[in-house]
């Protein structure tokens, strides 16, 4: 009987230790109003669409016949393109948006985070803004949304830019710590309520090529925006609904001139996938960036912009 008593005490101590760890990592949701002052200054605006208040930035000349639309990746936000938008908006109309489930837009009322739901969202956004044809840019998840939109509605996409894009299986080399937690179904009740800032910092360092580029402000942004009400649950739903690489056969149907950009130190999706895109897309140019990771447009806006400007000028 002594061993049963000892086992009971061990279980109690382990339970107490786990409870203390959960308590230490517990983070309440942030209400939208708590986040606006810091993360939605001008030129941010909100557009009512599909039952959501969609956070977006629409800058530059309104007579631009082919605006540039920027789509971010999973657990990110339009802020990932701030450097690009600021630099390009004097000459081009630039539209960046927080996709459903992320950033200040928050969760989809339907809870549908499949790629086809996102492509329909992008097309409805363009319709609402009265935009007929665009240069469509996407990073990671945003890249797959971009190329699938180009396949679904080729008349709406003049040119395509894919940055470390999802598309091929196996899609993921390594997964940031925050995504690993999100993929653990048995931990959902707990993980919807915890988000250690340290985990966010570790996750960001794993997707940047240079750790020194991961500033305290960037960690704050990813940390606070992922605490927006509903975003943690939306991330878990997206992970459940994701079918990485399931539609890769469709990539051959992309006919638009395409620029593929890839960070050579991307540890999340293999840089080899950049070559795969250009094997399957007939009018394709691949540019890689030494020293950059999974978010090259955010990590070094100036260097990646040079490649983008050259592509747009052709």
Q: Model-predicted segments: where are they?
A:
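Flexible "cap/lid" loop of the alpha/beta hydrolase fold
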Residues: 151, 160-188
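Active-site loop/oxyanion-hole signature of alpha/beta-hydrolase fold enzymes
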Residues: 49-50, 57-59, 99-141
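Catalytic active-site module of serine/aspartate enzymes centered on a nucleophile-bearing elbow/loop
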Residues: 284-314
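Conserved HGGG/HGGXW glycine-rich cap/lid loop of the alpha/beta-hydrolase fold
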Residues: 59-104
């Amino acid at each position: 009987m002594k061993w049963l008593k000892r086992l009971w005490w061990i279980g109690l101590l382990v339970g107490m230790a786990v409870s203390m760890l959960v308590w230490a990592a517990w983070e309440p949701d942030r209400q939208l109003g708590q986040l606006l002052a810091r993360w939605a200054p001008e030129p941010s605006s909100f557009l009512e669409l599909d039952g959501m208040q969609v956070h977006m930035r629409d800058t530059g000349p309104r007579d631009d016949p082919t605006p540039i639309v920027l789509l971010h990746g999973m657990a990110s936000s339009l802020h990932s393109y701030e450097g690009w938008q600021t630099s390009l908006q004097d000459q081009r109309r630039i539209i960046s948006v927080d996709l459903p489930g992320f950033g200040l837009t928050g969760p989809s009322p339907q809870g549908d985070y499949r790629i086809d739901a996102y492509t329909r969202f992008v097309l409805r956004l363009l319709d609402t803004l009265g935009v007929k044809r665009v240069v469509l840019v996407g990073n990671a998840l945003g890249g797959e949304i971009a190329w699938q939109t180009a396949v679904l509605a080729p008349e709406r996409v003049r040119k395509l830019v894919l940055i470390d894009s999802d598309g091929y299986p196996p899609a993921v080399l390594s997964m940031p710590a925050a995504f690993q937690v999100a993929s653990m179904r048995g931990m959902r009740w707990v993980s919807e309520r915890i988000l250690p800032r340290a985990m966010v910092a570790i996750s960001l360092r794993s997707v940047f090529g240079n750790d020194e580029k991961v500033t305290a402000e960037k960690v704050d942004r990813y940390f606070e925006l992922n605490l927006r009400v509903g975003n943690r649950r939306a991330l878990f739903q997206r992970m459940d609904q994701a079918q990485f690489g399931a539609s890769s056969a469709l990539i051959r149907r992309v006919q638009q001139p395409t620029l593929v950009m890839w960070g050579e130190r991307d540890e999340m999706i293999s840089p080899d996938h950049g070559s795969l895109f250009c094997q399957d897309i007939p009018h394709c140019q691949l540019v890689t960036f030494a020293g950059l990771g999974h978010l090259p447009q955010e990590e070094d806006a100036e260097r990646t912009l040079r490649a983008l400007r050259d592509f747009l000028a052709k």
